[in-house]
Amino acid sequence: MLKRIQQKWLAIKLITRMDKPIGTYLLLWPTYWALWIASDGWPNLQLLLVFSLGVFIMRSAGCVINDYADRKIDGEVERTKNRPLVNGMMTSGEAINLFGVLIGMAFGLVLMLSWSTIYLSVVAVLLAAIYPFMKRHTQLPQLFLGAAFSWGMIMAFSEAQGEIPLVAWLLFTANLCWTIAYDTMYAMVDRDDDVKIGVKSTAILFAENDKRVIGFLQLMTLALLWTVGDILAFGWPYQLCIIAAAGLFSYQQLLIVNRERDACFQAFLHNHWVGLVVFVGIAIEYL
């Protein structure tokens, strides 16, 4: 009995990527950008806890529904062939039940917020649920992932300010560009396998222009973040952090220059530091 419980817990840990927190970081940092700006640097404890836990739960739910959507093809991809729904550690029914539990937990958190934010949360759930299936229907699944990873920023402004100002949409667009850029790097890791099994991605769409498009998206991210700083009259510490982020992007371009799988994956992981550096720049402005 104990062994069975341990096996199920391991399956839950693996399918929700508890052992791989990079996705949580990439979702958390932009949410914190928005929370700090929307709250003038001082989000109340309840707001901070609700959005922090919400990020962890929704990222976990997104991983579960992603694996459910890919359960019939993950075995054909080197990186994903040992996932729980492929190796039999978890059944499809158990995965759907787990997804439902996680969405229920997230909804419980959202009920602590205003009605306008509750309504916006419905969009967040829809984006999280449909993204995994977009890989079969569009060459731009990363666009849907970007929207899913950015929607929490809109919710943060809605809750903290009761409105969604221009700055919120600029941050949303900046994060959208950034997400497409780093997830294209991630898709470059699996590109050869994806072509064979018919899965679509921006890495396949951009083809030989992948590095140039990623660079353009990174420049757009920096330009939009700089514009946010200008609108909010942020000073040199924030500007210095945006310049540092530009340096990190340049390093990522060096990593992906030869399109080697391991290097592309390292470039993807490296984006955690971009999110952190931008957050530090924002936080300093409110000290």
UniProtKB/Swiss-Prot annotation:
Species of provenance: Colwellia psychrerythraea (strain 34H / ATCC BAA-681) (Vibrio psychroerythus)
Source organism phylogeny: Bacteria, Pseudomonadati, Pseudomonadota, Gammaproteobacteria, Alteromonadales
Entry protein name: 4-hydroxybenzoate octaprenyltransferase
Pathway of action: Cofactor biosynthesis; ubiquinone biosynthesis
Keyword match Cell membrane: yes
GO annotation, biological process: ubiquinone biosynthetic process
Protein family according to the UniProt entry: Belongs to the UbiA prenyltransferase family.
GO terms for cellular component: plasma membrane
HAMAP family (alphabetical): UbiA (MF_01635)
Ranges that cross the membrane: 22-42, 45-65, 95-115, 116-136, 140-160, 162-182, 214-234, 237-257, 264-284
